[in-house]
Amino acid sequence: MEELPLSKSYQALCSFVRACTPRMKTVWAEPFSGAPSVFVCNHAGAFGPIDMCVKFPLRDKCHAWVNAQVLDAKQVPAYVRQDYWWKPGSLLAPLCNVTLPYLAAAVLPPILNAAPTIPVYHDARVMTTMRQSLKWLKAGEHLIIFPEQPSGFQSHHDWINTGFLN
């Protein structure tokens, strides 16, 4: 499977993030063999994916699973509202509800579509996710997945969501 080169704007954004945020330290529980691997990571809000895609030492050979809805500007507003990016019932919730989803729709898809991602579908297209993942693994690349169970505003359970594909 041939990978498209990362856009200059995505590379510049990654360089900016690396320069302006704390370094990431990778600590291996077991020595890493270099074989194609699936890295199961903590989402930690937006920081887990940003750290793994921008700072992880193996980032150039990694492909992150991303909810397909955030790759499509038309679907982002509904996804953002459902994912609770602001405290429900707060004084600013009405304003956030009419602004943040559309700002996210303008910003997220161009960035994420430029990144080495694999769309994760939650319908019959889930097989597309699996096929793409297997192709990258067979090509010697790695996967990054974030399978925690969302549990409300600024909160995720720390256990793996065993039904994260459906």
Q: Can you describe what each PLM-predicted range is?
A:
Residues 16-166:
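Soluble catalytic domains of membrane acyltransferases
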